[in-house]
């Protein structure tokens, strides 16, 4: 069972939202976003296997992670995935279409690394440099990562102070390594044509990890999707531009989705 932070709904709530974090993080990455979402929404932020408080059963597998979340969903839900969590969300929507009402993918990807027919991906050396820094001193570099995301954000210190203590409990080194290896190997491009739900894509114009070209690729492949690029955001638009992001997502979910 994956641990999750859950916010109960008001009695008339009809929507259920699941938030899926990215690599090297946990459910507390969404602690600043959750209070900005409508109080009538029941919201669950889940931990991926081996992250946060969730147990780790080897090996880390993207499809298995999606299946585990699907097992928690009892009616079509609105799924928001960030970075690696967006990849998990794609697998969830393709493998369990009856469990997904809509998708919001923010700073995410169908494939992370570049190849001959996918120039939108990252070059391996750039990815390796970033990951190496996190491996050497996670607590130091996750704080620096947050500081960079919130560079021009009012109350940046307050946001970091609220989420960093719980976020720093990132999971076991083995789980993080296997999750990264799985992300590097994963290729969900063959799943995109199977997805037939409303999709909102939100990317940061200054994101060097999942640059907007990855969002443009998803937009071309996911029929009926909507792409929004927040020009001054980087890899975590829901943190750096929390109010705008929350309003955008609220309008997407409550405004008919398409």
Swiss-Prot record:
Give the gene symbol: bioH
InterPro entries (alphabetical): AB_hydrolase_1 (IPR000073), AB_hydrolase_fold (IPR029058), AB_hydrolase_sf (IPR050266), BioH (IPR010076)
* Organism domain of life: Bacteria
Q: Which GO terms describe its biological process?
A: biotin biosynthetic process
Name a Pfam family for this protein.
Abhydrolase_1
What reaction(s) does this enzyme catalyze? 6-carboxyhexanoyl-[ACP] methyl ester + H2O = 6-carboxyhexanoyl-[ACP] + methanol + H(+)
Q: Where is the AB hydrolase-1 domain?
A: 17-241
- PANTHER family for this protein: AB HYDROLASE SUPERFAMILY PROTEIN YCLE, MONOACYLGLYCEROL LIPASE
- Binding partners and assembly: Monomer.
- What EC numbers are recorded for this enzyme? 3.1.1.85
Tell me the organism: Neisseria meningitidis serogroup B (strain ATCC BAA-335 / MC58)
Compartments (UniProt record): Cytoplasm
**Positions that bind substrate:** 23, 83-84, 145-149, 235
Q: What is this protein called?
A: Pimeloyl-[acyl-carrier protein] methyl ester esterase
Active-site residue numbers: 83, 207, 235
- Which pathway does the UniProt entry assign to this protein? Cofactor biosynthesis; biotin biosynthesis
Query: What GO CC terms are in its UniProt record?
Result: cytoplasm
The record's family statement is: Belongs to the AB hydrolase superfamily. Carboxylesterase BioH family.
């Amino acid at each position: 069972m994956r641990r999750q932070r859950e916010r109960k709904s008001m009695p008339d709530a009809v929507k259920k939202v699941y938030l899926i974090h990215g690599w090297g993080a946990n459910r507390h990455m969404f602690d600043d976003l959750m209070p900005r979402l409508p109080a009538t929404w029941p919201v669950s932020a889940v931990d991926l296997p081996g992250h946060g408080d969730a147990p780790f059963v080897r090996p880390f597998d993207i499809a298995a992670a999606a299946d585990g979340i699907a097992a928690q969903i009892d009616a079509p839900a609105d799924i928001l995935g960030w970075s690696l969590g967006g990849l998990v969300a794609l697998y969830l929507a393709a493998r369990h279409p009856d469990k997904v009402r809509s998708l919001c993918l923010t700073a995410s990807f169908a494939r992370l690394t570049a190849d001959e027919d996918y120039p939108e991906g990252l070059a391996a050396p750039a990815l390796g440099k970033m990951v190496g820094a996190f491996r050497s001193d996670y607590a130091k570099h996750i704080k620096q990562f947050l500081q960079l995301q919130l560079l021009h954000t009012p109350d940046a210190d307050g946001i970091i102070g609220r989420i960093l203590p719980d976020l720093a409990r990132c999971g076991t080194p083995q789980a993080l390594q296997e999750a990264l290896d799985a992300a590097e190997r994963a290729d969900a491009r063959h799943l995109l044509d199977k997805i037939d739900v409303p999709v909102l894509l939100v990317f940061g114009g200054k994101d060097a990890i999942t640059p907007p070209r990855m969002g443009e690729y998803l937009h071309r492949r996911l029929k009926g999707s909507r792409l929004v690029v927040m020009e001054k955001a980087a890899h975590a638009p829901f943190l750096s531009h929390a109010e705008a992001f929350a309003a955008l997502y609220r309008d997407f979910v409550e405004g008919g989705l398409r």
